[in-house]
Amino acid sequence: MTSGSPQVSSRALPSYVFPTVGPALFEALRAARPKRIVIQVPAGLVRNAHDLSSRVEQEVGVPVVLATRPCFGACDFPSIDEAPRADVAIVLGHAPIPNVSVVRPTYFVEMRQPGGDPEALAATVAAGGVPRRLGLVVSVQHLDLIEPFREALRLRGYEVQVGRGDRRLAYAAQALGCNYTSAEAVASQVDAFLFLGTGRFHPIGLAFAVERPVWSLDPLQNRLEPAIDRGALIRQRQLVVATVRDVRSWGILVSTFAGQDRTPMALALQERARARGRETQVLVFDRLDPRDLEGRALGAYVNTACPRIALDDGVNYPKPVLTPPEFLMAIGELPLEPYRFDTYH
């Protein structure tokens, strides 16, 4: 599962994966001869969406529509209902999830970025006191930087590990908000992890998933952020678990998104809850809104969709929302320690 030599190449990905918007993408689209294209963009690229739409329309010669619903990740590609007349989709900013089937021909454009100078980035890490036995995790946009950056760290005396995750991850070292198995694969060989990318979303998720300090480095600004306080994150979630141990009526949340549907897990949790004397109700949704859970005669919820709903947005809901492992803690089937991240495989 680890790599002592550069092995950050992809698994056998299909030809509809492209690093950037450019001639190769346009050529593939023209060859597909679509009648209409739908484009999905993440929040960070919305400002550029209209220019991109015009460019694709001009290059390919067919109508293009933009999906305006918020995009929550690679698991959340446009459904048939969102653009029923589009026979091809373009998804920007994400790699495909290998074990999730798409509903129409879909072209994933990962929006790769070169990032900063590897030597300068390594110097920043060394100056920041990051431990020398280090695991690297990266957002898909900065995958091309991993190898030169890893070599620059090695020249400064770092022992660097890159892990290969499970079947949900397309690349070694890759991070998904629901899956950090690339880090878990090498956790026993490192003293800390460094996330290479922007924002706190992945560092926080990684801190939940591994019992190691998690630092983060913005490769665009060459800015090193201190280690996440994992203890505080875990204590906060344990407090939520403690407050619902006496709850007798539970809602079990199930997503209809193709990449988030864990109906078998929901039904299994329902059986285990009933065996422990709890009442349960399964609730199905596509995009979950806190208002959807208002006024219901339920004491708490367990969410089988994206684990980040509970971990990042739980405070916005009218009743506590737990991940499946937290739910099993609450009904007495699992101990509070060690904390278990809800990895979506």
Question: Whereabouts are the PLM-identified features?
Answer:
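The feature marks the mature, well-folded catalytic cores of soluble enzymes
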Residues: 8-24, 29-210, 214-226, 230-238
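Short loop/edge segments at beta-strand edges and connector loops
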Residues: 68, 164, 284-286, 323-325
